[in-house]
């Protein structure tokens, strides 16, 4: 896998965090974007990804872990604490990828000469007590690129942001994941 990061102008700390877990034939990537930007947003999203990883290691199913994190965010004394929640879990034997999204930006699946979009209509974790996270599955194949991002990346694009990102993804030439991510952010 490869990761590219960038912060908002005049910000030294990003409000985004991620976690990667690979065990029992599953590769799980969790991405969270805390409310706002800077250190407070960073702490919020860091809490989300760390708790999610701990719940998975303890044997909780992904959806249950997400619901417990949502409840925890609702119980925080600081009003208005919420974070997006974006999980892709790939079965390394079958190639089936399960998505779980809460208020998250679209995820893009690039395959050869086309790009598919996995979108979410649910709210971010910590906003309401009965959050219904969006779930779906897709089959991945050798050579596919799964691209997850927070809203800041899309917000930097003009016009129809989703269509712009699809076009940018098709233009990236690097095949190594880290270089792919770097090239995408440089565009």
Language-model segments: residues:
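PP2C/PPM family metal-dependent serine/threonine protein phosphatase catalytic domain
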Residues: 1-15, 70-76, 105-137, 182-185
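N-terminal entry segment of metal-dependent catalytic domains or homologous docking segments
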Residues: 1-35, 40, 46-47, 133-136
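Short, glycine-/Ser/Thr-/acidic-enriched flexible segments
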Residues: 6-8, 25, 35-36, 92, ...
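Acidic loop->beta-strand submotif enriched in PP2C/PPM serine/threonine phosphatases
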Residues: 12-24, 85, 117-160
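Short hydrophobic-aromatic micro-motifs
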Residues: 27-30, 99-100, 146-149
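Active-site-proximal, acidic helix/loop segment immediately C-terminal to a metal-coordinating Asp/Glu
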Residues: 37-58, 140, 144-187
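Extended hydrophobic-aromatic, low-complexity segments
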Residues: 40-41, 98, 108-110, 116-119, ...
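Catalytic core of PPM/PP2C metal-dependent serine/threonine phosphatase domains
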Residues: 42-112, 179, 183-187
């Amino acid at each position: 896998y490869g990761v590219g990061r960038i912060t908002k102008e005049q910000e030294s700390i990003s409000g985004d965090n991620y976690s990667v877990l690979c065990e029992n034939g599953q590769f799980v990537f969790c991405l969270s974007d805390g409310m706002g930007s800077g250190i407070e947003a960073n702490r919020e999203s860091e809490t989300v990804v760390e708790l999610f990883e701990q719940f998975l290691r303890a044997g909780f199913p992904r959806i249950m872990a997400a619901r417990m994190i949502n409840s925890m965010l609702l119980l925080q004394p600081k009003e208005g604490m919420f974070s997006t929640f974006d999980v892709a879990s790939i079965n390394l034997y079958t190639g089936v990828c399960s998505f779980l999204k809460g208020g998250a930006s679209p995820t893009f699946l690039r395959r050869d000469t086309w790009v598919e979009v996995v979108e979410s209509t649910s709210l971010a974790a910590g906003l309401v007590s009965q959050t219904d996270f969006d779930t779906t599955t897709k089959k991945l194949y050798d050579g596919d690129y799964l691209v997850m991002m927070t809203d800041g990346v899309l917000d930097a694009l003009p016009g129809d942001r989703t269509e712009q990102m699809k076009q940018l993804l098709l233009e990236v030439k690097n095949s190594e994941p880290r270089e792919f991510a770097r090239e995408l952010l440089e565009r």
